[in-house]
């Protein structure tokens, strides 16, 4: 009897293994490219006619370009951790910069790996040691990978196992500060090849700062082109799904760590010749927590019960369909103490700031940049617009409300305008419902500033951590999705 049971169990395991191998053989390869500190409107395909991104522009032309993809945080590791888990930052247990993800959560590359994918990460990796289990291969040595982290992309593509589909998480350091002394790809003339964002002042220093930033994006762009050439050479381009996106807005005042569109709206391009018709645009509202369940569905893998996002795979075939009504985002500690929350619909944006007494000039790399110094110098002479002054404003509004259709740059706070009373109340209600359902809590002791907001010098509180948002309700164990 025991021998019969053993034979049955062996047969079941063989059949199960065979099914996984068969499913994996038919599944698409997936390449997820996540740029570092790149704004949505700093790509040619999104309307920037100064920056040189021919390969990303072609990727968009060959696939599907999303115009309303929103991150859950405009902060490096919290944003990436949110994508990896399909959860809001306060639900990951890693809502603050450089906080490691806990072991009890599932990471979507891990589920792909279990389904038979060869899983690899190249480049930036700071989501914590527990995520190591999600990858067969980690190539994170910056010296070996090159200054931007892209030198190993094609080497990995050539060396991968050829008998299974692959998932690559490609995380270049481009375009994170400090800028590389030399970059591959097209260069940008500060005088003629720059579109100065309205949040910055147009000075020689700002233009040079932006030129270095543009050069790093163009370097990344060049490697995207070389990667696609290698896919074609190997004859696997047709069934390889490529995504290009970014973790947060540009590392300049007014973008990175901000809850405006300049901070959390992100480029999102998907190319998959076998599954997506070329030359399409999707205007549906989507959250970055929706990426994990989408890629799992495409691969034929059931999402973990911990996932709060919803698959938008149907938009690959029908990009004209509506998806979300609301997207939510949060700003927690990133060099400086913070507790802000936002909810955005297609038409309106509402922001709640529990620490309005503080300014928000961005993290230290942004607020100590040449562009920030140019802003401060211009303010001293009394020459800033509303948008330019916003990064230096103190105190800030406790609430902000913008009409995205009439005011796309989000310059006029309408929270006190009676004409918008119903819309303000609706988004207030949605934000509270989201916080209640997902277990978001305001810490009694926020992680303090690690640097002086004006000088950038380390404070006495450097390296000290406070309470994580959501910790009081154990939000990392709450799986409710909140309003959709």
What is the predicted role of each segment?
Residues 2-13, 20-400, 408-436, 440-446, ...:
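Formylglycine-dependent sulfatase
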Residues 403:
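A contiguous binding-surface segment within folded domains or other stable secondary-structure elements
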